[in-house]
């Protein structure tokens, strides 16, 4: 199986909207079918302890994301969406803290609709509809933003982003010191 790697947040592919997916795109990127791509995406997401991952986060031009798989989210339900589209969302919004594999240690309070309905193709190419609520809804909306070329840092003011970035830098420095201290023992 092909190993996928996260690309840095300043890579233009992370900030570029992705064209619709077609199966003939797979071969030029060394995947034999949707199932192999889906498996590679879940493997990469799990390697970095994520709960969602979009193809452009690993440098692939596929309109596809994977989400879930964590036991505390919808009972561990995992989903892969090809060519997803939000067809409706609730009026009720929730403010929650979000993170992103593209921006390690950065957490931001983001307001999103509590519920949404996605239309998408599954790993077998069949058209599906998912009525999502709560955390799974939030994850899929976050990943859908990536497909549109938007990142979660765009949902907050520059002041809030700077404050969160400073906090992330402190956390990274704290972890480095911890690692150095434990390696010396």
Name each model-derived stretch.
Residues 1-185:
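Positively charged
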């Amino acid at each position: 199986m092909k190993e996928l790697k996260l690309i840095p947040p300043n890579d233009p592919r992370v900030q570029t909207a992705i064209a619709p997916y077609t199966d003939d795109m797979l071969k030029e990127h060394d995947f034999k079918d949707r199932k192999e791509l889906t498996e590679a995406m879940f493997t990469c997401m799990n390697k970095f302890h994520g709960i969602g991952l979009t193809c452009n986060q690993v440098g692939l031009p596929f309109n596809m994301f994977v989400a879930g798989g964590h036991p505390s989210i919808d009972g561990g339900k995992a989903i892969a969406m090809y060519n997803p589209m939000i067809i409706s969302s609730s009026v009720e919004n929730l403010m929650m803290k979000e993170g992103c594999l593209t921006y390690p240690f950065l957490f931001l309070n983001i307001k999103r609709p509590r519920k949404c309905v996605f239309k998408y193709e599954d790993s077998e190419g069949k058209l599906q509809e998912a009525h999502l609520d709560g955390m799974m809804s939030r994850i899929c909306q976050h990943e859908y933003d990536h497909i549109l070329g938007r990142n979660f840092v765009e949902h907050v003011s520059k002041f809030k982003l700077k404050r969160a970035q400073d906090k992330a830098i402190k956390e990274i420095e704290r972890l480095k010191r911890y690692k150095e201290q434990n390696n010396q023992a």
